[in-house]
């Protein structure tokens, strides 16, 4: 029974309110601890992580994880208790996540650059007993968490070594490791697939000021992340006749069976063999050995966007457990430096990177162009692919990147913090059409249906929309789905529903299915702007504006309007050295949009406010728009 009700939010909550019962009760094969032990046992001497001059094999990494896990046990951290991780991408971030998971405690992500009240809220909302944090943010976090009653320990790490003074009473990460054994922690309980895996905080939604914690158990979270790769793989399998895509596929998952199928890769039965092989062997020691033996040198993946963002976290762990890749981190992960990225790809021979749309792709394009103008060259022959998720990636920027690096395969995925199956599209330079994220995702039939059904449901009728009619509906995901929102029973009931004995997540995103049976994402239902009774999605208008050759970035939001109820405001960042007038934007939009979708207000800024994840800082943006329009608009 949930207790401590306060409005729609609970003061206290328990994982028992979310716990699922599975047929194979008491198993532990789908836990992060089990996955790490498998890698350390099967390929102990393969490189696991690289950051700057530091290199760790799976055996070394597992030893450090065990030391931290034993330290956490000595600190009396119990199974099911929440432990936060605050920092940017680092080996220590990964060690912390695995160590917390090994003892059955629950890791949760903290964006260290979030507003202070938001950080305080997340730590308090999780009822955290400890926070493991990067030294740069330690003193600030220590100051704002003084009055959180549940918090017992602050543990501070540096990327390799400490660079900032410690807050009073904090523990030193490396000292804890030095004082504890590298042997596997001895538990007097079992961590099972049914247990609390992690709590993931995304962006604030709807009327909520702060983000909601998304509850995952191991069965859904670990297995779902493992399966995420095969959903990314699907559009690649559908186009294996393209040599670039085939090379990228073999490089990402170099199983010898796949190589043997190369001569017949255009035949449907060859693809069926690959899919069947994956379904039978995924996550096993046999599969790990197959991938490890398929390539003498490690396949190297680099998460560029932050790990505290769910899309990056999921894809990074997917690459580890499904592809057995070596993970490379930038030496300095924030602020993002595109030159450092390209130099690292060149030096470490990185195979693929993970980004969040235009916010990361545009600086990469700019640096490649600048290097070309200055006569500098990068040896990027190893770089085969870019996987993006979470933030829209415009067709124009995709094409520019492919023109600069013709060998690249672009994989653009659609997903949410609340479900792991990501539905993807693959693009190469030769493609005539490079759609934005969420478009041209295969909806029915073929290989795209082997994982989990994905539907578009008419909000009024409750039935699936008719394809090819333009009928709008809400995206609904089935398969590996989170269990609910922490301390938010009403939101959980609204968004997580059992339909036909299977759990579904109602995403709140709107779109339709075109005549080719492809999903077409239009916008988020919560961001719909009503103009004189007509529904307008800001994303649709933004895509048109961003296609203008002088525009670097843009965002479109709705504001109150006396006559029409709401009106559109376009906030635009121009390319360096370019000029554009408000009327130019209006005329450009009128060429492809009806009059009611044309922005009433156009504003130009030097740079748009984006979070470290690449997402727009909506609160800052709205404050700016309000100040420009005047408080009477609100």
Predicted feature residues:
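Gly/Ser/Thr-rich phosphate-binding loop
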Residues: 171-174, 321-322, 342, 351-355, ...
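ATP-dependent adenylate-forming carboxylate-activation enzymes
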Residues: 87-88, 105-123, 135-140, 326-348, ...
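Conserved AMP-binding/adenylate-forming
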Residues: 54-55, 69-114, 304, 535
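AMP-binding/adenylate-forming catalytic core of the ANL superfamily
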Residues: 114-121, 131-133, 346, 353, ...
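Conserved AMP-binding/adenylation subdomain of ANL enzymes
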Residues: 222-303, 310-354, 366-367, 371-372
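ANL superfamily adenylate-forming
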Residues: 13-14, 139-196, 218-225, 240-250, ...
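Structural core segment of the AMP-binding/adenylate-forming
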Residues: 2, 74-75, 102-175, 187, ...
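N-lobe entry segment of adenylate-forming
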Residues: 1-75, 79, 160-167, 185, ...
């Amino acid at each position: 029974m949930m207790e401590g009700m306060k409005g729609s939010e609970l003061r206290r909550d328990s994982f028992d309110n979310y716990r699922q019962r599975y047929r194979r009760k008491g198993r532990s094969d789908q836990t992060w601890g089990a996955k790490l032990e498998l890698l350390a046992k099967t390929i102990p001497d393969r490189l696991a992580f690289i950051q700057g001059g530091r290199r760790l094999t799976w055996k070394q990494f597992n030893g450090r994880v065990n030391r931290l896990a034993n330290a956490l046990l000595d600190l009396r951290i119990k199974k099911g208790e929440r432990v936060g991780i605050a920092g940017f991408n680092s080996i220590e971030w990964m060690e912390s996540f695995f160590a917390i998971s090994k003892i059955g405690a629950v890791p949760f992500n903290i964006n260290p650059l979030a507003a202070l009240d938001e950080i305080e809220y997340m730590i308090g909302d999780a009822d955290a007993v400890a926070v493991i944090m990067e030294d740069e943010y330690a003193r600030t976090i220590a100051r704002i968490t003084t009055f959180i009653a549940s918090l017992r320990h602050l543990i501070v790490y540096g990327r390799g070594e400490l660079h900032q003074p410690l807050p009073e009473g904090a523990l030193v990460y490396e000292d804890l490791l030095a004082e504890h054994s590298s042997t596997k922690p001895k538990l007097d309980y079992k961590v099972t697939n049914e247990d609390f895996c992690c709590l993931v905080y995304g962006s604030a939604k709807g009327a909520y000021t702060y983000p909601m914690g998304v509850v995952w158990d191991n069965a859904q979270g670990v297995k779902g992340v493992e399966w995420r790769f095969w959903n990314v793989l699907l559009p690649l399998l559908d186009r294996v006749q393209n040599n670039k895509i085939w090379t990228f596929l073999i490089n990402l998952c170099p199983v010898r069976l796949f190589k043997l199928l190369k001569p017949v890769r255009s035949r449907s039965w060859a693809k069926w063999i690959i899919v069947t092989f994956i379904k039978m062997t995924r996550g096993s020691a046999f599969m790990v050995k197959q991938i490890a033996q398929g390539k003498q040198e490690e396949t190297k993946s680099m998460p560029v966007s932050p790990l505290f963002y769910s899309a990056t976290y999921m894809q990074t762990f997917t690459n580890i457990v499904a592809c057995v890749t070596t993970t490379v981190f930038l030496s300095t992960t924030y602020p993002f430096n595109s030159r450092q990225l390209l130099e690292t790809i060149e030096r470490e021979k990185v195979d693929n990177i993970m980004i969040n749309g235009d916010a990361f792709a545009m600086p990469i394009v700019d640096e490649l162009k600048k290097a070309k103008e200055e006569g500098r060259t990068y040896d990027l022959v190893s770089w085969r692919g870019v996987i993006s998720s979470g933030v829209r990636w415009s067709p124009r920027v995709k094409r520019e990147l492919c023109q600069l690096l013709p060998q690249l395969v672009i994989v653009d995925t659609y997903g949410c913090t609340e479900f792991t199956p990501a539905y993807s599209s693959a693009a190469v330079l030769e493609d005539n059409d490079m759609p934005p994220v969420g478009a041209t995702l295969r909806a029915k039939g073929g290989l795209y249906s082997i994982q989990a059904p994905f539907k578009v449901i008419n909000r009024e009728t409750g039935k699936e929309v008719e394809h090819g009619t333009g009928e709008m509906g809400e995206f609904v995901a089935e398969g590996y789905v989170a269990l609910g929102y922490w301390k938010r029973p009403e939101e959980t009931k609204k968004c997580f529903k059992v339909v036909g004995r299977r759990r579904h997540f109602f995403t709140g995103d709107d779109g339709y299915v075109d005549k080719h049976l492809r999903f077409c994402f239009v916008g988020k239902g919560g961001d719909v702007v009503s103009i004189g009774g007509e529904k307008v999605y800001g994303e649709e208008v933004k895509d048109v504006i961003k296609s203008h050759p002088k525009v670097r970035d843009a965002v479109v939001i709705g504001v109150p309007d006396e006559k029409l109820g709401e009106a559109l405001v376009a906030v635009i960042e121009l390319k360096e050295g370019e000029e554009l007038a408000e009327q130019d934007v209006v005329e450009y939009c009128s060429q492809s949009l009806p009059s009611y979708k044309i922005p009433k207000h156009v504003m130009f800024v030097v740079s748009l406010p984006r979070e470290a994840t690449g997402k727009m800082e909506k609160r800052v943006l709205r404050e700016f728009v309000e100040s420009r329009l005047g408080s009477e608009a609100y």
